[in-house]
């Protein structure tokens, strides 16, 4: 089983319900919940609220670790294969579209070279994303055409891959499943309000203090973790780029809503996903029974 969809839709709770109903275990596919200590800002389900359901691939990386979908893919498939061999149902839960596809579909990822990546990261900081995009366009026009000039992270990755392999494909191949899987999509008409409520709850739970603690663990040096929703906005406030905690909070709400729209667009393109408008395990039971 896989439970996917935009943030704040109720995927985590539904994943636990499904695991309890089917005798399963949760496998995380939220790229930011892989980071240790990033708990409040990623809405990681506290252990006391997991209702005895084992959760895998939470708290795997330090905040200084760069995103690595290839290693995540290997780890997730190893865990899923082990659960299947033991007669347990893996329940993959997350809204990180590439990470979900990396596990479920026949995707291969080019290798990485930290030295090459660091050199292009430095160049990004020096000249900016649009100028670096021009360089990508000169070396790999088709790749550049598929990447926004403002998306520095993807531009750097594309340049790294071009340097290492001589080519880069910016689009993913067609869906080709590795597993027999039922994918449940959770979306809600009140998502904007739920996002605002979640961010308010984050601040009430001491989210800025969590960010302060993670700064001491190297959050600023983490190329991926420091850009996470909420964390980037609080760091900007700490650095004086925002005037107040309230401004950082409102910026987090806006950025999260924008991200949720992108998530929705990503997952809606996959016609293998059966969509629910509420995270209801009864609907899931009926759906599974009809397949």
UniProtKB/Swiss-Prot annotation:
Substrate binds at residues 7-12. One of its GO terms (biological process) is tRNA modification. The record marks 96, 117 as: Interaction with substrate tRNA. It catalyses: adenosine(37) in tRNA + dimethylallyl diphosphate = N(6)-dimethylallyladenosine(37) in tRNA + diphosphate. It holds the Pfam family IPPT. The keyword Lyase does not apply. It is an enzyme of class 2 (transferase). Residues 30-33 are annotated as: Interaction with substrate tRNA. Its cofactor is Mg(2+). Keywords: ATP-binding, Magnesium, Nucleotide-binding, Transferase, tRNA processing. HAMAP family: IPP_trans. Monomer. Catalyzes the transfer of a dimethylallyl group onto the adenine at position 37 in tRNAs that read codons beginning with uridine, leading to the formation of N6-(dimethylallyl)adenosine (i(6)A). Belongs to the IPP transferase family. This is tRNA dimethylallyltransferase.
